[in-house]
């Protein structure tokens, strides 16, 4: 065995170990920056491609289950206005169509996407049709299962809202009766946006 190459071999091995450690630290830092509640991917409504919710870390997140044929469907307009008004300050609205209540979301993902954009000009992120009700059992969307666990409150109808604070752990629940333009709701959103 030629030992003259040993120092260069050791140097290369050290470089590879250091590079591996740096990559592992970077991956760990990324995962550490994402709260457990948002550490998941969901398929987008428009193309069904997975989208990580970690990208919303550090934002105030309004999660709402939606339906196209509900008495509360007009809340899309208020949700879009809320999103447009506060997105530059760190708010995002995430819509999750569901057919769980009154079968008021019977369409396909493409039909729902078309309805949302053509009827209400929805630009906030929307995800594929999902199950949000406690009656869904094991089929309930895992994000909704965690939101229910965090608040002790499950959606009882379409347009139930959860608000996740920037810390990713503080969660509040609002029934469908709370409109997106409700003064108390807006005040709470503004307080959460003002918090680090």
Report the location of each language-model feature:
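Bacterial N-terminal signal peptides
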Residues: 14-26
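Bacterial N-terminal signal peptides that target proteins for export
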Residues: 2-17
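Loop/turn elements at helix/coil->beta-strand transitions in domains of secreted/extracellular proteins
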Residues: 57-61, 87-92, 120-125, 158, ...
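Structural microenvironment flanking redox-active thiols in thiol-disulfide oxidoreductases
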Residues: 72-140
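Amphipathic alpha-helical repeat scaffolds
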Residues: 65-69
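Surface-exposed acidic, glycine-flexible loop patches that form ligand/cofactor-binding
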Residues: 52-54, 84-85, 150-155
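N-terminal "domain-start" segment that seeds a small globular fold
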Residues: 30-54, 74
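Thiol-/selenol-based redox modules, centered on thioredoxin-like
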Residues: 142-196
């Amino acid at each position: 065995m030629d030992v003259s190459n040993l120092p260069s071999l050791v140097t290369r091995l050290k470089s590879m170990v250091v590079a591996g450690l740096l990559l592992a630290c970077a991956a760990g830092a990324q995962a550490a920056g994402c709260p457990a509640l948002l550490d998941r991917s969901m398929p987008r409504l428009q193309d069904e491609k997975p989208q990580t919710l970690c990208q919303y870390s550090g934002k105030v997140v309004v999660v709402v289950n939606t339906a196209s044929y509900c008495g509360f469907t007009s809340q899309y307009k208020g949700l879009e206005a809320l999103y447009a008004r506060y997105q530059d300050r760190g708010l995002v609205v995430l819509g999750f169509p569901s057919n769980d209540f009154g079968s008021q979301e019977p369409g396909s993902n493409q039909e729902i996407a078309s309805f949302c954009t053509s009827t209400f000009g929805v630009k906030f992120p929307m995800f594929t049709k999902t199950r949000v009700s406690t009656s869904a059992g094991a089929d309930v969307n895992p994000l909704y299962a965690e939101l229910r666990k965090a608040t002790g409150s499950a959606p009882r109808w379409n347009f139930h809202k959860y608000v996740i604070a920037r810390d990713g752990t503080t969660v509040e629940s609002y029934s469908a009766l709370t409109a997106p333009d409700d003064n108390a709701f807006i005040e709470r959103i503004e307080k959460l946006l003002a918090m680090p």
